[in-house]
Design a protein with these regions (language model features):
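Eukaryotic N-terminal low-complexity, Ser/Thr- and Lys/Arg-rich leader segments
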Residues: 1-2
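Conserved alpha-helical substructure of the radical SAM core
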Residues: 5-95
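Radical SAM/AdoMet-radical enzyme domain recognition
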Residues: 49-68, 77-183
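A C-terminal junction/extension of Radical SAM enzymes
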Residues: 171, 176-179, 183-229
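A short acidic, helix-capping loop that chelates divalent metal ions and anchors anionic groups
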Residues: 40-43, 128-135, 192-197
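Short histidine/acidic/glycine/proline-rich micro-motifs that form metal-
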Residues: 41, 74, 102-103, 164-167, ...
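Short, small-residue-rich loop/turn micro-motifs
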Residues: 26-28, 124-126, 188
Length: 229
């Protein structure tokens, strides 16, 4: 916007759009059965830092102030901390989040915090090592848990994203998150594409299990302030 006047966008319900997700790469180091199963080859594609920064600059001119970096797996993006630092120095950028599988988080947490990362969402579907290997195709659960602990030590706001499937022990995931004082969000797998081949657990069954353990589940009056996983 050459005039310096910031425009804004609204959705069909009149709500202001101020949030953008940027997929830095479609490559990932894991092969989750509901996302990129074993045997599917992902070409290594990265958006250049220049492209990302131009995208952010243009988005800010449209009133976008909150950004989340995703993938694939964003922590395999070369020098992601340098990209985040440049984004943080851009006028109009208020929030930078990352969604990651957490495998490389223990070695990146401090530099991500220093660069200006506001929050990290860790995708974690189980804390059982055998189930983790079945879901992801890799035996690196310990790396993810160490990454979560490192992010907590760095005082980065943290949240766990868990995809609901029949294999997922919802109560154990809640206890894990509660023990570490982390928010957890359960994500429903849609029965389309790869999702048709996965054993989906109905939301009603999850609510019944939660109410049996914790009592009546209360609804929410408004959306959470982080705009999605």
């Amino acid at each position: 916007n050459r005039t310096g006047v910031v425009k804004s966008m609204t959705d069909g319900y009149g709500r202001k759009i101020d949030y953008m997700r940027i997929s830095l790469t479609d490559n990932c180091n894991l092969r989750c059965s509901y996302c990129m199963p074993e045997g599917k080859i992902s070409d290594i594609h990265y958006l250049t830092a220049e492209t990302v920064l131009k995208c952010v600059e243009s988005a800010v001119c449209l009133g976008i102030t909150n950004f989340r970096l995703t993938g694939g797996e964003p922590l395999i993006y070369p020098d992601i901390e340098k990209l985040i630092a440049k984004m943080r120095n851009m006028s109009g950028v208020n929030f930078i989040g990352i969604t990651t599988n957490g495998v490389f988080l223990s070695e990146k947490a401090d530099v991500l915090k220093t660069a200006g990362t506001d929050s990290i969402n860790v995708s974690l579907d189980t804390i059982d090592s055998d189930e983790f290997r079945k879901i992801t195709g890799h035996s690196c659960l310990r790396n993810v848990i160490d990454g979560i602990d490192a992010a907590l030590d760095s005082r980065i706001k943290l949240k766990i994203n868990t995809v609901l499937r029949s294999e997922v022990d919802v109560l154990k995931m809640i206890e894990f998150a509660n023990d570490k004082n982390i928010d957890i969000r359960f994500i429903e797998l849609m029965p389309v594409g790869i999702g048709e081949k996965n054993d989906i657990i109905p939301r009603k069954a999850v609510i019944e299990k939660l109410e049996k353990k914790y009592g009546k589940v209360c609804g929410v009056s408004k959306m959470h302030d982080e705009n999605g996983p």
